[in-house]
Amino acid sequence: RRAAGDIRCLSGSRDGFTTALRRFGTYGPMVRRVLKDSGLHSDIQYLPFVESSYSPKAYSRVGAAGLWQIMPATGRDLGLVLNATVDERLDPEAASWAAARYLKNARKTLTVAARAKNSKVSSRELSPFVITSYNYGVNGMRRAIKKMGPDYIQVINQYRSRKFQVAVKNFYAGFLAARHVARNQKQFFGDIKPGRPLQYQTLILDRQVSIARVQSVFGLSEAELKVLNPALTRFVWHGWRLIPDGYKLRLPRRQDSWRNQVARLRMMPFETRQGGSVEYTVRTGDTACGIAAAFRVVCRALFAVNC
């Protein structure tokens, strides 16, 4: 009864969670593999339900992107490529490895902080702190532990900080709720047909290449390539930039491994981006100098032809 006043209900999310469960069928096996190889608990596979509804295309109003909702600066710190042609935050596998690196560091950092206050604290007791740090930040949780000790309920009820507000306090509870529903999806939603895990093989490009050439050589549609290569930006898909050399191009898995097509691609002349002008529709969050950098022109020159 005392806790009843603290219970919060979220309505209107049934269809969204059903869609997330289908996506979970597509990306969940890969996420579980990454977590296992990283030495992290398998329960973390339910975190993207809270972050993005398991959508690799998700964007937040503050600039976080992808399955794991990674901010640009954080992504670069975690080793992801973010430039005009590639944004690995949108690649579910690359982003999952980055998230795993973040969570491993969080676990290590918060364990040190917690055991400085209580040497007998267990990894299980630290799990809520690690999960919450994904929303609040490692340093924020470290400060909370330093001030209140490694008692999560005490931190939730008594810790005071300008940014430690309702959304942060509810984050772990939301994670537990998502885990419960995902584990018991038949009870809540009946039979849901999960998405099929992606099957692909990787070709490391030894040169820059246009998306048009890839489509032509391999006989693949833009839609087929987009599903497997979500990290490529709109500048590539519109033909304004080439796919960079060294990029790990994903292709549908085939028994012959596309041998003839790969050989043909490597025999073709090198491509260079065509000159001239292009039209670009400005989107929310764009800046003039950011667009200029994407097209490799001087910001001042962009102003000159548009003013």
Go through each PLM region and give its residues.
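Extracytoplasmic and endomembrane cell-envelope/extracellular-matrix remodeling and assembly machinery
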Residues: 1-33, 37-38, 77, 82-85, ...
